[in-house]
């Protein structure tokens, strides 16, 4: 399906959006790309982001978007090394908790927490990362019953292949072919929102026969960019396939899964990465994502986009064409 799309921040490079509705207003929490001069490589060193802005709006497709400025930077974070990648924010009891991936001073990705009294920040970081945290792409789900869940993980530069059973390996292992694909992770958060309340679990995605997706199934298996939303009582776990550049989704009956693969949300865009948020606002559903058209294909200089997202009568997401030409 081709659909009208809008670039939201044409004057800057913003990507990897997390999007939520707080107090009737829509807030966007993107990563902030810039020209760092670092050569492109499979570890993603060229994605050398160092701060976050927050944006808000009342009218998605036509309204003004407000930039609330820098709300957190690596200079504010005591344990910071480099590469402040994509974050997410959740509200509990009037406090706003930002979860962010950042390499520590040993060049290992950890997940940190920063807190604000306002959805637009500024966010004050904790002195240390979450205990036992690793990898990238935190996405937080408020299940509406007092429980909050954090999804995380990403391959290659995201370092997920360096871990098994939540323990670091001596060397990274990437499965191949018919071996089971490396899954995303999920854990319930502690009451104070600062730690895992339990050991992170695998987010298993099943094929049509009820079998876990394999590493060789690169157009369906998880790579990075976890997101969760709920529609008509079903849990929709969506994600990027990374090196095949698709946004896909799977559905399940609870936040832990397992989830059964359903299809493609967004076909490849211009640029290597694809990352997204799905949110309902004022009776319509939207897909926030990014591409590299304004930077003429520089994959480390991405631009924030949005379009409407639709479901068919059976609750399947109607696939959106990533390229507009």
Curated annotation (Swiss-Prot):
Molecular function (Gene Ontology), one example: alpha-L-arabinofuranosidase activity
Keyword field: Carbohydrate metabolism, Glycosidase, Hydrolase, Multifunctional enzyme, Polysaccharide degradation, Xylan degradation
GO biological process: xylan catabolic process
UniProt cross-references to InterPro entries, sorted A to Z: Glyco_hydro_43, Glyco_hydro_beta-prop_sf, Glycosyl_Hydrlase_43_Enz
Gene3D superfamilies: Glycosyl hydrolase domain, family 43
Assigned EC number: 3.2.1.37, 3.2.1.55
Regulation: induction: By xylan.
Entry-linked CDD domains: GH43_CoXyl43_like
Site (Important for catalytic activity, responsible for pKa modulation of the active site Glu and correct orientation of both the proton donor and substrate): 137
Catalytic activity from the UniProt record: Hydrolysis of (1->4)-beta-D-xylans, to remove successive D-xylose residues from the non-reducing termini; Hydrolysis of terminal non-reducing alpha-L-arabinofuranoside residues in alpha-L-arabinosides
Enzyme active site: 16, 224
Family from the record: Belongs to the glycosyl hydrolase 43 family.
Protein name (database record): Xylosidase/arabinosidase
Organism phylogeny: Bacteria, Pseudomonadati, Bacteroidota, Bacteroidia, Bacteroidales
């Amino acid at each position: 399906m081709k659909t009208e799309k809008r670039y939201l921040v044409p004057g800057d490079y913003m990507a990897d959006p997390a999007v939520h509705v707080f107090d009737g207003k829509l807030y966007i929490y993107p990563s902030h790309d810039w020209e760092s001069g670092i050569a492109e490589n499979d570890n993603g060193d060229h994605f050398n982001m160092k701060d976050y802005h927050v944006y808000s709006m009342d009218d998605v497709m036509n309204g003004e978007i407000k930039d609330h400025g820098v709300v957190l930077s690596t200079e504010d974070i005591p344990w910071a090394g480099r590469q402040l990648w994509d974050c997410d924010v959740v509200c509990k009891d009037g406090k706003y908790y930002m979860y962010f991936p950042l390499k520590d001073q040993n060049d290992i990705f950890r997940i940190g927490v920063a807190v604000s009294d306002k959805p637009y920040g500024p966010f004050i970081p904790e002195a240390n990362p979450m205990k036992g945290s690793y990898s990238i792409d935190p996405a937080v789900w408020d299940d509406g019953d007092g429980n909050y869940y954090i999804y995380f993980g990403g391959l290659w530069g995201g370092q997920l292949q360096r871990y098994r059973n939540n323990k670091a390996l001596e060397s990274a292992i990437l499965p191949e072919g018919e071996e089971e694909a490396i899954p995303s992770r999920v854990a319930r958060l502690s009451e104070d929102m600062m730690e895992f309340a339990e050991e992170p679990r695998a987010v298993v995605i099943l094929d049509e026969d009820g079998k876990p997706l394999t590493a060789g199934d690169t157009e369906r298996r998880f790579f990075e960019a976890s997101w969760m939303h709920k529609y008509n009582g079903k849990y929709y776990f969506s994600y990027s396939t990374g090196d095949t550049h698709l946004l896909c989704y799977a559905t399940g009956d609870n936040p832990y899964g397992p989830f059964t693969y359903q299809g493609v949300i967004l076909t490849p865009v211009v640029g290597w990465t694809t990352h997204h948020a799905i949110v309902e606002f004022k009776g319509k559903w939207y897909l926030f994502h990014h591409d590299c058209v304004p930077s003429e294909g520089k994959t480390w200089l991405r631009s924030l986009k949005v379009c409407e997202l639709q479901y068919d009568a059976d609750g399947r997401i109607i696939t959106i064409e990533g390229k507009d030409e």
